[in-house]
Amino acid sequence: MESRALLAVALWFCVETRAASVGLPGDSLHPPKLSTQKDILTILANTTLQITCRGQRDLDWLWPNTPRDSEERVLVTECGDSIFCKTLTVPRVVGNDTGAYKCFYRDTDVSSIVYVYVQDHRSPFIASVSDEHGIVYITENKNKTVVIPCRGSISNLNVSLCARYPEKRFVPDGNRISWDSEKGFTIPSYMISYAGMVFCEAKINDETYQSIMYIVLVVGYRIYDVVLSPPHEIELSAGEKLVLNCTARTELNVGLDFSWQFPSSKHQHKKIVNRDVKSLPGTVAKMFLSTLTIDSVTKSDQGEYTCTAYSGLMTKKNKTFVRVHTKPFIAFGSGMKSLVEATVGSQVRIPVKYLSYPAPDIKWYRNGRPIESNYTMIVGDELTIMEVSERDAGNYTVILTNPISMEKQSHMVSLVVNVPPQIGEKALISPMDSYQYGTMQTLTCTVYANPPLHHIQWYWQLEEACSYRPSQTNPYTCKEWRHVKDFQGGNKIEVTKNQYALIEGKNKTVSTLVIQAAYVSALYKCEAINKAGRGERVISFHVIRGPEITVQPATQPTERESMSLLCTADRNTFENLTWYKLGSQATSVHMGESLTPVCKNLDALWKLNGTVFSNSTNDILIVAFQNASLQDQGNYVCSAQDKKTKKRHCLVKQLVILERMAPMITGNLENQTTTIGETIEVVCPTSGNPTPLITWFKDNETLVEDSGIVLKDGNRNLTIRRVRKEDGGLYTCQACNVLGCARAETLFIIEGVQEKTNLEVIILVGTAVIAMFFWLLLVILVRTVKRANEGELKTGYLSIVMDPDELPLDERCERLPYDASKWEFPRDRLKLGKPLGRGAFGQVIEADAFGIDKTATCKTVAVKMLKEGATHSEHRALMSELKILIHIGHHLNVVNLLGACTKPGGPLMVIVEFCKFGNLSTYLRGKRNEFVPYKSKGARFRSGKDYVGELSVDLKRRLDSITSSQSSASSGFVEEKSLSDVEEEEASEELYKDFLTLEHLICYSFQVAKGMEFLASRKCIHRDLAARNILLSEKNVVKICDFGLARDIYKDPDYVRKGDPRLPLKWMAPETIFDRIYTIQSGVWSFGVLLWEIFSLGASPYPGVKIDEKFCRRLKEGTRMRAPDYTTPEMYQTMLDCWHEDPNQRPAFSELVEHLGNLLQANAQQDGKDYIVLPMSETLSMEEDSGLSLPTSPVSCMEEEEVCDPKFHYDNTAGISHYLQNSKRKSRPVSVKTFEDIPLEEPEVKVIPDDSQTDSGMVLASEELKTLEDRNKLSPSFGGMMPSKSRESVASEGSNQTSGYQSGYHSDDTDTTVYSSDEAGLLKLVDVAGHVDSGTTLRSSPV
């Protein structure tokens, strides 16, 4: 029992002690107890002050604000007899030690205070460091008091305040003027506002003592406003710098204090700078600025930021919100429309809703062409079209580009412009035309509308039943309209019909109303309706019995032309023919709502003089217009009197005269490209009065109609049938009238080859013979000249180098031979084209080589050469690279040497193979939308599993047969077997039109391994193996290349500056980074990174990881990349094996070739099995050993956390077991620590150019690198490195913009490269492997 009681007591004591130590209350928390019980303690100077404080938890002391050199005199020690006890000791105290001494619990406000007076009669006033350099700020406010901080070391002094100048003394009055030894002298501020300085004075034993002088500054207090800049909500990405400016505007003589409140106020990287801003001349305000800076924000910095300005009497604040994003992003918001409909003439707005940081660059395209703002369109966050027309209809694409990550998002909106029905006759037919009695008449209504019409209807009404108001747009108003089918009381309608016709390039509806006989004057209305609106036309069908009016000439009159109006009447029926012009003021005379006929008001009309001609039956009255003008337009009335009834009959004719207009071509003539034998048709739309005469020219020569050239529609339409090569050229359409001419040009490009005539062949042969003669003569002359080979060789320019273990560095390049008789190629047979890559001192150019290959006349090649001003060392480096390429020899999966131009008389040029599809990284990124991981069922060339089985057996056999024996150096001109032999066995297909499958990725990996195995067999080390240095040729063949001379690595984010050279750190093995060791096995590490690039479809390695010293350390400690999005467990295991920390444990390239070949064969044997994307947990539980099930990508794992785990934890499958059994290496661990397991900070992206660096990202394993310090022994700063961007697309795109080849370069060359028979077999198998799985051929547009 006794032991239990002791145990209980001990437990209670531990609990209480723990509660006190962590700040948790036990029963209660009492203030600390001091050794003195007094609140005020008085001691003499030069004595020792010692106070002990005891409490219930950790204690600490605060004492008066003393100078820094006296802080060493204050001792705080632990008591020996208690846990929570501290003693404060101040030896030899002085007057300035007077003040409050505080003992308190840490992290709480619970404390005990004692005020200590150190009486020193020689220095009764305390000179405290808190006196702010003897300045007292006051405001002229009668209600405000100011405290002069002249505190005393003696509590009962008799103190007065002296002010000067003028001098004045103030003594305490017990009211508003007082002195307190703990605070100082208190006085109303207005009493000393006049003074320049003040001080306190006291008398002790007839001795007068003074405090320090205090300068009096009269200040204001009003704060007008506080403004934050930027004023709106701030968005930043993690790692970026935050700068907030807080500007306060106050009255003059204001002292201001700033304070900031924000989420991470204890941020160690924050910096606050306060300063005055110089006020503008003439202003009565003062400006203060406080700047808050956080160099690298994190997610914890997100929140509300408040700036507070305090002047002593006034406080003002302003706030803003700072939003911190994990990384730059961009996405379209919800609600983006894909279809917008508008009515012609209206204003259209197409807004863009997006979520992005930072604000994106916005580009608009219409039907693939960029749009710029003009007077009809405004582009920006929304597209605004002022008055939309039909021409504006089309597909509008908005492309958003994130300026940091360069990620792009696009959205297409189709704009449909609806056109309400437009009736063409409205502007052409006068509403006052008249029709002869009893005649058959046809009324037409030509309607254009979009979308098509719902219907067209005809209505009619008697003329007397409607009112006429000429001032209105539609002058006729009828209370009701009758359908034409109800013609009771009107004219009989024979038929109505609708037809469709192509008029002026538009599909229009022509509605026709046939009136059997014109007996009754009436109004006819044509009404058309579609979804956009309605249109109508009212026709005045005025029936007369009398004269007829005609216009001569019959064509539409134009100003400054001569024309005549003829009024013809039967001479036996009518007499007194007279012409009148109907003025605007006398168009008609109204009687209420009824219309008085024109003939009843002829006296109000303007009578015209005319000439009368007569024939046997008619009288004709003619009014002639010489040089007609626009003023001659109007309504003309011909009046004739009936001889029997004396009744006048009037006929009205509207005369329209067109304004003269210079010719104009109203549309654009676009260039056209076609092939031989096709038909070209182009329309030249014109306008002008008089009607222009159209003439066509070809290459400035008049074009006339021929058997294949047809001109129609007044020469507007030009058609060329069965085009020939000579039909290509510049075609000009010229439209002329009396006012001038207008021209428009278009270019016809004719592609294809047509058979040449015998004469052409003879000319070509003769020219070739003459050229060959001069070429031989030039060769004889040039061969007599020798060029020097002296100078130092700067091996740092090379990337594919000899193995340093095989030969000393200074001898290995010099001893390599160059056989000019085998490799020299004449410069005059090389036609240089467009540049493919350009660096600091080198460049690669596309060229046509004539006669470099005996199988063709012309072959497209790539030429490596130096830029102007290259040094002798750079010239030697390129020459050494040429020798290395000769030494390496020929291989299908290496960009092979074809020839060189080394003789004097021109630049040094190295000619290599041209790969038309560019580098593999760019190609894979462009094919992400066409990636199909599974096979479609069925075979491509023949159906059933027989073919697949045959292929798989033959595939493995022939892959094994292709060895590095092909490596013997051959001529630069001829090989044993042409690739055309292989093309005869298979159909040639465009590479960019095939879907990308998992089998393609394995095939590419296998080919690169074959190429690296070959380079290793030739004792060569490639020190920049990456997807940007893998080129893609025809038929899915990949080739290892190095365009070190043509890549500007100063601007390439994949190359990080480390010391003197720039290095591709993401691809380098740890031993290369730290020890500058380049071996075949360090190339295996780079091959593993290349596999990651391939199975991520061109992403940049280590996405989101800052490439710095920390990255290198983690890499050396075993942290590796996560599995790429499109890989299999087997391929990821292969990558991990390549990344083994021990170089000797990494697989050899020969082992990788065997393993990847087995995977490729296993892939071909799947016999119709589709690949299914499974969660990793399901994938790893499968017992199949094919190795072809795809894991879920880490992205999808994040979306479905319950189903899969984004980390790879699995045992090696059977598919890789054989590969490991035959290896000397150990298997990788079942789990891998990846960079996703480690929190990452978003780096600030910046590029540091340095012209002093070498041009190549692939540096030699030379003495130059051996001088660099050993990274294992030293730990230098990696500050000179360029951090990678947080978005993988930025780095990957940036790294490939300067690569040797760019995708999209196409060659007209129809010839093929010559390969050995073994390589031709490999080429065939590679191509079949790329196509056998597709079943039905799937194609897409070229990237």
UniProtKB/Swiss-Prot annotation:
Reactions listed under catalytic activity: L-tyrosyl-[protein] + ATP = O-phospho-L-tyrosyl-[protein] + ADP + H(+)
Residue intervals of the Protein kinase domain: 830-1158
Residues bearing PTM Phosphoserine: S978, S980, S1227, S1231
Tissue distribution of the protein: Expressed in the post-pubertal mammary glands.
Membrane topology value: Single-pass type I membrane protein
Entry's family note: Belongs to the protein kinase superfamily. Tyr protein kinase family. CSF-1/PDGF receptor subfamily.
Listed name of the protein: Vascular endothelial growth factor receptor 2
Encoding gene per record: Kdr
